[in-house]
UniProtKB/Swiss-Prot annotation:
Function: Binds to the 23S rRNA.
Family according to the record: Belongs to the bacterial ribosomal protein bL9 family.
GO cellular component: ribonucleoprotein complex; ribosome
A GO term for molecular function: structural constituent of ribosome
Pfam families tied to this protein: Ribosomal_L9_C, Ribosomal_L9_N
Protein name stated in the entry: Large ribosomal subunit protein bL9
GO BP terms, alphabetized: translation
Protein backbone atom coordinates (compact mmCIF):
# COMPACT_ATOMS: atom_id res chain seq x y z
CA UNK A 1 0.00 0.00 0.00
CA UNK A 2 1.41 3.38 -1.00
CA UNK A 3 1.31 6.07 1.71
CA UNK A 4 2.66 9.60 2.11
CA UNK A 5 4.53 10.13 5.38
CA UNK A 6 3.40 13.14 7.41
CA UNK A 7 6.09 12.62 10.07
CA UNK A 8 9.59 11.19 10.16
CA UNK A 9 9.39 7.44 10.79
CA UNK A 10 12.61 5.68 11.84
CA UNK A 11 13.70 3.04 9.29
CA UNK A 12 10.94 4.13 6.89
CA UNK A 13 11.43 7.69 5.63
CA UNK A 14 11.21 11.45 6.01
CA UNK A 15 8.28 13.86 5.84
CA UNK A 16 6.75 13.76 2.37
CA UNK A 17 8.22 10.46 1.23
CA UNK A 18 5.93 8.10 -0.64
CA UNK A 19 6.66 4.62 0.63
CA UNK A 20 5.20 1.18 0.11
CA UNK A 21 4.22 -0.49 3.39
CA UNK A 22 2.18 -3.52 4.38
CA UNK A 23 -1.56 -2.85 4.45
CA UNK A 24 -1.96 -3.77 8.12
CA UNK A 25 0.89 -1.46 9.20
CA UNK A 26 -0.72 1.43 7.34
CA UNK A 27 -4.31 0.75 8.49
CA UNK A 28 -3.54 -0.14 12.10
CA UNK A 29 -0.65 2.20 12.96
CA UNK A 30 0.42 4.87 10.47
CA UNK A 31 -2.98 6.26 9.44
CA UNK A 32 -4.71 6.16 12.88
CA UNK A 33 -1.67 7.80 14.53
CA UNK A 34 -1.72 10.60 11.93
CA UNK A 35 1.75 9.71 10.67
CA UNK A 36 0.68 8.94 7.09
CA UNK A 37 -2.14 9.25 4.55
CA UNK A 38 -2.98 7.04 1.60
CA UNK A 39 -1.22 8.13 -1.60
CA UNK A 40 -4.18 9.15 -3.77
CA UNK A 41 -4.04 12.01 -6.28
CA UNK A 42 -6.14 14.24 -4.02
CA UNK A 43 -3.96 13.50 -0.97
CA UNK A 44 -0.77 14.12 -2.95
CA UNK A 45 -2.03 17.55 -4.05
CA UNK A 46 -3.23 18.35 -0.53
CA UNK A 47 0.12 17.30 0.92
CA UNK A 48 2.13 19.42 -1.52
CA UNK A 49 0.09 22.44 -0.39
CA UNK A 50 0.89 21.67 3.28
CA UNK A 51 4.50 20.48 2.84
CA UNK A 52 6.16 23.61 4.30
CA UNK A 53 3.85 23.58 7.33
CA UNK A 54 4.55 19.90 8.07
CA UNK A 55 8.32 20.33 7.65
CA UNK A 56 8.27 23.32 10.01
CA UNK A 57 6.33 21.27 12.59
CA UNK A 58 8.84 18.42 12.30
CA UNK A 59 11.75 20.85 12.76
CA UNK A 60 10.06 22.41 15.81
CA UNK A 61 9.51 18.97 17.37
CA UNK A 62 13.18 18.11 16.81
CA UNK A 63 14.34 21.40 18.38
CA UNK A 64 12.07 20.88 21.40
CA UNK A 65 13.41 17.34 21.87
CA UNK A 66 17.00 18.60 21.69
CA UNK A 67 16.23 21.25 24.32
CA UNK A 68 14.69 18.61 26.61
CA UNK A 69 17.76 16.39 26.06
CA UNK A 70 20.00 19.25 27.18
CA UNK A 71 17.85 19.69 30.32
CA UNK A 72 18.06 15.95 31.12
CA UNK A 73 21.82 15.94 30.63
CA UNK A 74 22.16 19.04 32.83
CA UNK A 75 20.51 17.17 35.73
CA UNK A 76 23.55 14.89 35.93
CA UNK A 77 21.95 12.33 38.22
CA UNK A 78 18.70 11.46 39.96
CA UNK A 79 18.39 9.59 43.25
CA UNK A 80 15.61 7.06 43.88
CA UNK A 81 15.03 5.55 47.33
CA UNK A 82 13.66 2.01 47.53
CA UNK A 83 13.38 -0.76 50.10
CA UNK A 84 16.31 -3.16 49.86
CA UNK A 85 17.66 -6.24 51.60
CA UNK A 86 21.03 -6.65 53.31
CA UNK A 87 22.78 -7.81 50.14
CA UNK A 88 21.84 -4.75 48.09
CA UNK A 89 18.95 -6.36 46.21
CA UNK A 90 15.70 -4.42 45.99
CA UNK A 91 12.33 -5.67 47.17
CA UNK A 92 10.68 -5.18 43.80
CA UNK A 93 12.27 -3.24 40.96
CA UNK A 94 12.75 0.26 39.60
CA UNK A 95 10.86 0.43 36.29
CA UNK A 96 10.50 3.02 33.53
CA UNK A 97 7.55 4.55 35.39
CA UNK A 98 9.64 5.10 38.54
CA UNK A 99 12.49 6.68 36.56
CA UNK A 100 10.07 8.94 34.65
CA UNK A 101 8.44 10.09 37.91
CA UNK A 102 11.83 10.83 39.50
CA UNK A 103 13.06 12.86 36.51
CA UNK A 104 9.74 14.73 36.32
CA UNK A 105 10.00 15.51 40.04
CA UNK A 106 13.53 16.84 39.39
CA UNK A 107 12.08 19.35 36.93
CA UNK A 108 12.17 17.80 33.44
CA UNK A 109 8.91 16.35 32.12
CA UNK A 110 9.54 12.83 30.81
CA UNK A 111 7.01 10.18 29.76
CA UNK A 112 7.62 6.57 30.73
CA UNK A 113 7.58 5.61 27.04
CA UNK A 114 10.71 7.74 26.54
CA UNK A 115 12.76 5.85 29.16
CA UNK A 116 15.07 3.07 27.96
CA UNK A 117 16.43 0.60 30.52
CA UNK A 118 19.02 -1.41 28.53
CA UNK A 119 19.31 -4.20 31.12
CA UNK A 120 15.65 -4.36 32.08
CA UNK A 121 14.21 -3.16 35.39
CA UNK A 122 16.75 -2.04 38.00
CA UNK A 123 16.93 -4.61 40.82
CA UNK A 124 20.09 -3.59 42.73
CA UNK A 125 21.37 -0.61 44.71
CA UNK A 126 24.00 1.66 43.17
CA UNK A 127 24.56 3.72 40.03
CA UNK A 128 22.78 2.77 36.82
CA UNK A 129 22.97 4.39 33.38
CA UNK A 130 19.57 5.14 31.87
CA UNK A 131 18.94 6.41 28.34
CA UNK A 132 16.03 8.49 27.12
CA UNK A 133 14.75 8.55 23.54
CA UNK A 134 13.03 11.91 23.31
CA UNK A 135 12.61 11.85 19.52
CA UNK A 136 13.39 9.42 16.73
CA UNK A 137 16.96 10.70 16.59
CA UNK A 138 17.46 12.51 19.92
CA UNK A 139 18.85 10.55 22.86
CA UNK A 140 19.95 11.62 26.34
CA UNK A 141 21.69 9.75 29.16
CA UNK A 142 21.33 10.14 32.90
CA UNK A 143 22.84 8.46 35.95
CA UNK A 144 20.20 7.00 38.30
CA UNK A 145 21.41 6.36 41.84
CA UNK A 146 19.34 3.82 43.78
CA UNK A 147 19.68 4.05 47.57
CA UNK A 148 18.07 2.07 50.40
CA UNK A 149 15.23 3.68 52.35
Amino acid sequence: MQVILLDKIVHLGQVGDQVNVKSGFARNFLIPQGKAVMATKANIEHFEARRAELEATAAANLAAAQARAAEVTALGSVTIASKAGDEGRLFGAITTRDVAEAVTAAGVKIAKSEVRLPNGPIRTLGDHDVRFQLHGEVFAALDVIVVAE
